[in-house]
Amino acid sequence: MYETTVRILRGDRSGTRGHQEFRAQIDEGMMVLDVVHQVQSQHANDLAVRWNCKAGKCGSCSAEINGKPRLMCMTRVNELPKDQPITIEPMKRFPLIKDLVTDVSFNYRMNKTIPPFKPAPRPADGVYRMMQIDVDRIQEFHKCIECFLCQNVCHVMRDHGHEDFAGPRFFIRIAALAMHPLDTRSRLQQLKDAHGLGLCNITKCCTEVCPEHIHITDNAIIPLKERVAGAFYDPLAWIWRKVLGKQAEQKQAP
């Protein structure tokens, strides 16, 4: 057991913010969330913190620990430098509610704009069939726990504003839908325009902070970029669409 200093950035919607220091007793195996609960219990009963499972599966306790976006419940104190304070701050890219709690409602609004899964009609025998390789491809995306650390660290969201860019979390969701072998709905136009996929310049900062180790950039964003490029910027594809469009118009003509 040893004692250390914990610096927590405190504030609320009024704009008043400042670091407050506390002393905490550190036991073997403690997580940063345990330290926050100790501070809340012994020193600052009004400290606001969002948490739920304490097992790295709910994504609730996202914060910035010593400047790095991480889950508090999965960050071991003994992995942090002992010669400096443990600095805990809320996610910087979302509006502050109070102390370590931020308003992440933008993400839920964005989620509603994504067209849902639309399966192909059932075959005559009523049984859907898929290749295992296609099923395996999208399993990684389903590991997302919606901690929104990728949204927080994405510099495009920092520079361009929330409403102009869906963010890595939702490119994962769209990739899971688009790569599903039974899905029939196209979301490419929306990706290109409303969701701003082209703004991403694949720096992989989102991949680096993902607690589920999802290869967001390589396995979701880049394949989506390739599909958008093929659909809208390939000259042969453009000519082919024009030809099909004219044929459709001729068929509809009286």
Model-derived regions, located:
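Ferredoxin-type iron-sulfur electron-transfer modules in oxidoreductases and energy-metabolism complexes
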Residues: M30-Q42, E89-P254
